[in-house]
């Protein structure tokens, strides 16, 4: 069974290879309770198709409304990444279903490079761990095969996330 990140990235790579506009959303910061952990990803196609999750529902619905059906759909033509924060106020946290006053910050990447996504998916299919770093100002992406997973890093200039095989532990025996 394919892990969720690979599933999301594979769909995103297919959409981009077919020339479809799309975005990749990554949870880069949370405060308080959050339905999905830092590093969770979701892909949204211009058609409104969604793969993956960043919140469990309401935020995904808002992203669909913003970027596939509404006035901000033009952003899908813009290559500059954006940070988007949900749950800043108690009313907003309630509206988007964020538990216990949680706040969530997303990095939105518009129209990631199709060739880079295909390389990423190929490395993941080969069972490699990959570190993907996005420059928030320029949108430039650097992907490198790495030896071990590292936690997501979000500094003032870059966001770096690791993708790769999931570790499994099997316990076999009686008793």
Where do the language-model regions lie?
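Segments forming oxygen-rich coordination pockets for charged ligands
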Residues: 1-175
């Amino acid at each position: 069974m394919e892990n969720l990140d690979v599933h999301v990235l594979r769909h995103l790579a297919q959409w981009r290879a077919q020339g479809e506009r799309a975005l990749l959303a990554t949870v880069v910061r949370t405060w308080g309770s959050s339905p999905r952990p830092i590093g969770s990803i979701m892909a949204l196609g211009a058609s409104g198709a969604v793969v993956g999750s960043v919140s469990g529902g309401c935020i995904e619905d808002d992203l669909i409304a913003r970027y596939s059906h509404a006035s901000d759909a033009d952003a899908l033509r813009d290559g500059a990444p954006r940070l988007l924060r949900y749950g800043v106020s108690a009313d907003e946290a309630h509206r988007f279903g964020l538990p216990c006053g949680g706040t969530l910050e997303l990095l939105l990447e518009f129209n990631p490079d199709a060739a880079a996504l295909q390389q990423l998916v190929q490395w993941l299919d080969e069972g490699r761990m990959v570190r993907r770093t996005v420059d928030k100002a320029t949108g430039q992406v650097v992907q490198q095969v790495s030896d071990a997973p590292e936690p997501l890093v979000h500094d003032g200039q870059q966001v770096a996330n690791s993708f790769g095989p999931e570790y499994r532990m099997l316990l076999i025996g009686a008793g």
